[in-house]
Amino acid sequence: MLKLVCAVFLIATVSAKGYDTGSRYSIGNYLSGYSGYGIGNRYSIGNYLSGYNGYDRGSRYSIGNYLPGYSGYGTGSRYSIGNYLPGYSGYGTGSRYSIGNYLPEYSGYGTGNRYSIGNYLPEYSGYGIGSRYSIGNYLPGYSGYGTGNRYSIGNYLPEYSGYGTSSRYSIGNYLSGYSGYGTGSRYSIGNYLSGYSRYGTGSRYSIGSYLSRYSGYGTGSRYSIGNYLSGYSGYGIGNRYSIGNYLPGYSGYYGGSYPSYRSTLTGVSQSLSFGRAVMSGQAFGAGVPAFGSVNFGNFGVGTGGIGILGGGVIGGGGVIGGGGVVGGGAVIGGGGGIPIGGIIRKKKY
């Protein structure tokens, strides 16, 4: 209890955290002032983000429950993640992210990349030319329809979902065949991904419970997020992210940046950055710097298990579902989101 109070006090007393030009990280429960304000990449993660967090030109991240004002408003990439997003969150030109339960009209509407994630997406969400994201229970009309990058996230994705050249996103429970297979960036998110998901060159994202061998293997940036990633997850040259509980082998091993966030680091990752030393993971809980039991609401308690980030933003026993980011009542939840652990569990195979 004393450890928890000290951590909350430390976070709450920070004013104008991450203020200036360049990349900014502001992570906690109560972020004061203009956290992450300025030009450049901005990260504002917590429950109650005050003021115009992440407001200005450049990429903006605003993640929490109640985001005030025009969070992530302006030109450039915008991230607005929460339950009740006011006004035109992520409105404008460029990449747009709008994630929540009740997204207002035309969320992420316009030209460029479009993200619309929630329960009830309005007609033609993410419709047009370019990258398209349509994530939810009931996707109306031509969700993610058109040419370019395609995102199809839901209950029953047909065989070879997102198959072909270009970036591919395949998110669900049972993705068949070589989901996201080919050249370019590949995203494979789910419980049981078969074969060499996202195998090849380019950026690779592998998120789920049981990802098959060599997930994210090759050159480029690699992300391996989950509980039990087998083989050489995130192995190669470039920036490497390995986030989860027990990542075996050489996770995030080789030249480049080595952020490794988890409780029990195995192999050489133990001695790399962001282990148990930086920001004293024990003080924040779960042994993960700034992503432990204090941050991300509900003190990191997921409804379905440990989760990746202490059961908070990403958690509940899996990346998607059971109180995690999408589903079950966490950041994007309330019984909604992608029904991992809801509709899907009721299907008989």
Swiss-Prot record:
Species of provenance: Margaritifera margaritifera
Record has Secreted as a keyword: yes
Tissues in which the UniProt entry reports expression: Prismatic layer of shell (at protein level).
GO CC annotation, single: extracellular region
Keyword terms: Secreted, Signal
Location within or outside the cell: Secreted
Descriptive protein name: Shematrin-like protein 1
Signal peptide interval: 1-16
